[in-house]
Amino acid sequence: MRIKLLIIAFAASLLFIPQSQAQTSASGFPKGELSNAKNHTGNIWLSELNVGDSTFDPSIAMATYDAGAKLDWHIHPGGQVLLITEGTGYYQERGKPTRIVHKGDVIKCVPGAEHWHGATPNDTFAYIAVTPTAKGKTIWLEPVSDKDFSSVK
């Protein structure tokens, strides 16, 4: 009887966990907080897994996108590696064709490359981003045009 009461109490306590803490992605990492940054279109959640510092340089974050959400064009001075964990997305470097990326893909963004990434119009998208910070923070550029976003064949 005592075990049943403990189980009921535990289950009831789950109702009081804030939604942002209760949500996890399919990869098992926290979904994070809905971003209110001005450098994207659509809903994107961000969970900082490691804030880069002098001991552990790379910033590591989990990003989760609603269908059609995308980041603006941007540059990572130290490069970036994206480990795609869910869904289907787009990745494009300036002047190159847009690539369709899927769960399990690894994308290496070379230092200084202007690029963008986001979810396809009909699928959610998530990745773990590993971003060296010693050479500087992300440099944000202009929004991705509808032409660039819809040019995927």
Place the predicted regions along the sequence by residue.
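Bacterial N-terminal signal peptides
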Residues: 7-17
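A short hydrophobic beta-strand segment most commonly corresponding to one strand
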Residues: 122-142
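Bacterial N-terminal signal peptides that target proteins for export
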Residues: 1-7
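Short acidic-glycine-tyrosine-enriched beta hairpin
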Residues: 95-112
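A short, N-terminal "cap"/entry segment at the start of jelly-roll beta-barrel domains
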Residues: 17-57, 138-153
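Short beta-strand His + acidic residue motifs that chelate non-heme Fe in jelly-roll/DSBH
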Residues: 73, 91-92, 114-120
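Short, conserved beta-strand element in jelly-roll/cupin
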Residues: 62-66, 75-91, 130-132
